[in-house]
């Protein structure tokens, strides 16, 4: 049976990658067409995130709004991702109109699960962890523009006390080296110029190679950089403990590795880091940052921060602010701590008033935003290498792209430049983007 599928995504880049694969597997195996509105779809899928409590509640709000599509149109409603993995049957109990519940490791089984739900008239739940089977069953890679995500591993084995990822995505499993290279090469042939290598703990990648050896992330980056057409490489998300000497050296040796790094620290307090079971101190984190900056002068460093963790004192928070100033973090993500069921941190006592936590979060965000503004302002007058990825959202008569440090630049130029690296002189720093003047094609542009 053919039909139309709509996919909505909550959460991280890994979820965006998985959502594309959900649609692709239905397109390939059942002839579906992907649509942009749930009202036009025969199958409506929600790919969920369980990192934050509010994100989890958004799932059931969304499902409530979708109930009418099932009643009026007979649409099949499916829930995937980390909330599905965590809640399983409980989703159907709370939202009985849901037909299919599947985890991150079972999205490749979607066609069969949808068939079973339709034929049997009852909900189908499969949130098992069939190890590498997901990667073995992925559809052929399909490019949608000059940038692409490629998942190289799944899961996390760090078990930080606040985090649900090991429980929702399982232990770390690395995708075979040859499979990763084949996917990137295929995407490059389709016009992809920048690839982001994905994993919950991506620098723990240990991909088996055909000769029996193991490839780490640093070596993988060198192989990806050697592929025709690839002009820029990013990776996310990293853990400081796994940030190896060879990966630091990759920043010195490989010019195609973008000068921008997202390396979550969560806190600058050694006490809080210990409670979080992060496995490192603030000084050890700072030492790695200094070595990375020495290997790649001018690199932009972004991070994640949790404010109001149980037991965090004002002194602990001040330690975090000092680390932020020492590193000079660029645009980063920061949240109030949200206890997740089943994690060790959920049982910790917490006596800090909510208004104190909110005030700390505001101070932290103001500090980081001020750093980010200074970085943007320092770029005015410089010439940046920009990958043009589409028309400008602000002005359809202009084009836009991203710099190495991940800033959006809008500038006048012909749409035929989409998919090309160009040189742009930055003329203005705006709150959420830059403006620039096109100078020409980049001399070192990857073959297009």
UniProtKB/Swiss-Prot annotation:
Any Gene Ontology CC annotation: cytosol
Annotated residues for binding of [4Fe-4S] cluster 1: 12, 49, 82
Keywords: 4Fe-4S, Cytoplasm, Iron, Iron-sulfur, Metal-binding, S-adenosyl-L-methionine, Transferase, tRNA processing
Record-annotated TRAM domain positions: 377-440
Domain MTTase N-terminal: 3-119
Binding-site residues, [4Fe-4S] cluster 2: 156, 160, 163
Subcellular location: Cytoplasm
Domain Radical SAM core: from-to ranges: 142-374
SUPFAM superfamilies in alphabetical order: Radical SAM enzymes
PROSITE patterns: MTTASE_N (PS51449), MTTASE_RADICAL (PS01278), RADICAL_SAM (PS51918), TRAM (PS50926)
Single GO MF annotation: N6-isopentenyladenosine methylthiotransferase activity
Swiss-Prot/TrEMBL catalytic activity: N(6)-dimethylallyladenosine(37) in tRNA + (sulfur carrier)-SH + AH2 + 2 S-adenosyl-L-methionine = 2-methylsulfanyl-N(6)-dimethylallyladenosine(37) in tRNA + (sulfur carrier)-H + 5'-deoxyadenosine + L-methionine + A + S-adenosyl-L-homocysteine + 2 H(+)
Cofactor(s) annotated in UniProt: [4Fe-4S] cluster
HAMAP family reported in the protein's UniProt record: tRNA_metthiotr_MiaB
Family label: Belongs to the methylthiotransferase family. MiaB subfamily.
Reported function: Catalyzes the methylthiolation of N6-(dimethylallyl)adenosine (i(6)A), leading to the formation of 2-methylthio-N6-(dimethylallyl)adenosine (ms(2)i(6)A) at position 37 in tRNAs that read codons beginning with uridine.
Subunit: Monomer.
Name the record gives this protein: tRNA-2-methylthio-N(6)-dimethylallyladenosine synthase
């Amino acid at each position: 049976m053919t039909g139309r599928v709509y996919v909505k995504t909550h959460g991280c880049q890994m979820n965006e990658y998985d959502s594309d694969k959900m649609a692709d597997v239905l397109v390939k195996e059942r002839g579906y067409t992907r649509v942009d509105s749930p009202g036009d779809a025969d199958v409506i899928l929600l790919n969920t995130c369980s990192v934050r409590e509010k994100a989890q509640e958004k799932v059931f709000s969304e499902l409530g709004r979708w109930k009418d599509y099932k009643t009026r149109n007979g649409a099949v409603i499916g829930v995937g991702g980390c909330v599905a993995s965590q809640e399983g049957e409980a989703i159907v109990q709370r939202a009985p109109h849901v037909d299919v519940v599947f985890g991150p490791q079972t999205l490749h089984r979607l066609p069969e699960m949808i068939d079973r739900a339709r034929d049997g008239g009852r909900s189908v739940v499969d949130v098992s962890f069939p190890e590498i089977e997901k990667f073995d069953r992925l559809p052929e890679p399909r490019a949608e523009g000059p940038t692409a995500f490629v998942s190289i591993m799944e899961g996390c084995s760090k078990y930080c006390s606040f985090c649900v990822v090991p429980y929702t995505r399982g232990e770390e499993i690395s995708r075979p080296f040859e499979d990763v290279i084949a996917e990137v090469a295929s995407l490059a042939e389709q016009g992809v110029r920048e690839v982001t290598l994905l994993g919950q703990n991506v620098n723990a990648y240990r991909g088996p190679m055909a000769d029996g050896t193991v490839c780490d992330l640093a070596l993988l980056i060198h192989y990806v950089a050697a592929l025709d057409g690839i002009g820029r490489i990013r990776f996310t998300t990293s853990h400081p403990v796994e940030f190896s000497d060879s990966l630091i050296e990759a920043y010195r040796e490989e010019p195609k590795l973008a000068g921008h790094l997202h390396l979550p620290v969560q806190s600058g307090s050694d006490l809080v880091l210990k409670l979080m079971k992060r496995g490192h101190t603030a000084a050890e984190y700072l030492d790695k940052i200094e070595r990375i900056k020495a290997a790649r002068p001018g690199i932009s460093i972004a991070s994640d921060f949790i404010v109001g963790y149980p037991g965090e004192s004002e002194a602990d928070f001040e330690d975090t602010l000092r680390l932020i100033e020492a590193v000079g973090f660029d645009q980063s993500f920061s949240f109030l701590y949200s206890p997740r069921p089943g994690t060790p941190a959920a049982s910790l006592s917490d006596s800090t008033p909510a208004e104190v936590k909110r005030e700390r979060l505001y101070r932290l965000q103001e500090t980081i935003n001020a750093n980010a503004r200074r970085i943007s302002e320092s770029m005015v007058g410089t010439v940046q290498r920009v990958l043009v990825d589409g028309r400008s959202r602000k002005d359809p008569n202009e084009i836009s792209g991203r710099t190495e440090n991940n800033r959006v630049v809008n500038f006048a130029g012909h749409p035929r430049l989409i998919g090309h690296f160009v040189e742009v002189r930055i003329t203005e720093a705006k709150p959420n983007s830059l403006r620039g003047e096109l100078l020409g094609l980049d001399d070192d542009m990857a073959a297009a």
